[in-house]
From Swiss-Prot:
Residues given in the record as ATP binding sites: 15-20, 72
Organism: Oleidesulfovibrio alaskensis (strain ATCC BAA-1058 / DSM 17464 / G20)
Pathway recorded for this protein: Pyrimidine metabolism; CTP biosynthesis via de novo pathway; CTP from UDP: step 2/2
Annotated protein name in UniProt: CTP synthase
EC number: 6.3.4.2
Amino acid sequence: MKTKFIFITGGVLSSLGKGLAAASVGALLQARGLKVTIQKLDPYINVDPGTMNPFQHGEVYVTDDGAETDLDLGHYERYLGIPMNQRNNYTSGSIYHRVITKERRGDYLGGTVQVIPHITDEIKSVIMNLASDDLDVALVEIGGTVGDIEGQPFLEAIRQLRSDLGRDRCMYIHLTLVPYLAAAGEHKTKPTQHSVKELRSIGIQPDIILCRCEKAVTDDLKHKIALFCNVEKDAVFSAVDVKNIYEVPLSFYEEGFDQKIAIMLQLPAKNPDLSKWQELVDTCANPQGKVTIGIVGKYVDLKEAYKSLHEALIHGGVANKLAVELKYVNSELITDENVAESLAGLDGILVPGGFGSRGVEGKIRAIRYARENKVPFFGICLGMQCAVIEFARNVAGLPAANSEEFDEQTPDKVIYLMTEWFDFRSKQVERRDSGSEKGGTMRLGSYPCAVVKGTNAFTAYQAEKVDERHRHRFEFNNAYLDKLKEAGLVFSGLSPDGELVEMVEIKDHPWFLGCQFHPEFKSYPMTPHPLFREFIKAAGKQAVKSKR
């Protein structure tokens, strides 16, 4: 079977949940035995989100091949349980960059380079590159909202693909908002009508309309939407708000959403096996206990900045049959005087990754509190670096210890800029310096890690070698390895050549671990990451202890 394409657009307003909708549809088709992938096309001009402010964009999701991508790729991976790569995310910036590179190379033979056909052809090219003999369905999510100026080339490209592929290989799903007005006691369809009108004005007639709503849309209202939007009566579906995002595939299945897609695209009529999804939802709904985890960071005002982290902690809870309540603590507000009050009642403390000096001292205070008060601690990327700094200052007798990122003049740079490292994918030595460009110049993607036996890390992984995803410029300074080891710091994970420290721990503590990589990017609801599983297990023991 030739690869078939499903294009998902959004109307009325942004953040309706196109990514979750795409991931849920993909999961349903996958449960039918089909091979599925998902692609996200973002209309913004940035080449990738790697240098974007988390407050504007949210999390930057890193793939195995080192691509810095949209956070929706995290949803795709978690719902499908398969890794994404660079081909699964493009932006206007990356598309234009490809076209301009070709123009400079002379590929267009002196012709005038225009949005149509050159930009639209490039968009079609990256979409069609997904097609292969072993892929049944490719879902393509168009970022932004219908009507956005920057999104027009993408919509034009997918309009053309309908003619290129034919109706049996291409369909359009339009996600739109159907607000419920409590005062009037009814849903309003006008925003949806206008959104579809805008879409049809550029030549795209949606095949299915998915209505994001607080309450399920009635059959009468579905028929009204179908009439005004020129779709079949049974092609209007509700996307109702749910308590748990992992309920969405089950909700779509109950609506018959996947069945309609299968009929329209003439896909094999096999009933999906959703037993694992049902088991997951049941486990989430019936926990045997609860833990409270504090996330100490500086992007706490925008939870999307820690999206994968949030989900990975939930996964750890699922593995231990525990509900996980998250408390976000602004590290900039933590002082020596209020640290105990700020972190009171927590069963576990997690310090996530980040960049820059703002809020770092608050993180270090939180880590000291966790270490001295025997509260389970998990440090990720910058969180591990801060744990090393705290240990060096307060245990190893290096009061001026710091990271070169925060203080270039410190006499004890226990964390310093990585200037070269061996890339196990390209089999080459990568080099960077302080003058390198910011975008795409970090240690990015999946790298192997040797795990030391007899450590918390080995207890979690039960393996001597693992592969984890990285996103950092700074690393532990090996000049301090012996001194910190003598003071009691355990180096439980190293690069295979022994040159780079990947994990550290502390003995005589319930659970204290820092890792230089980002394990949250490899945690799936069906297969929680081992480190999150063990962290939540330790937090569960702490919760029981606190109740006594």
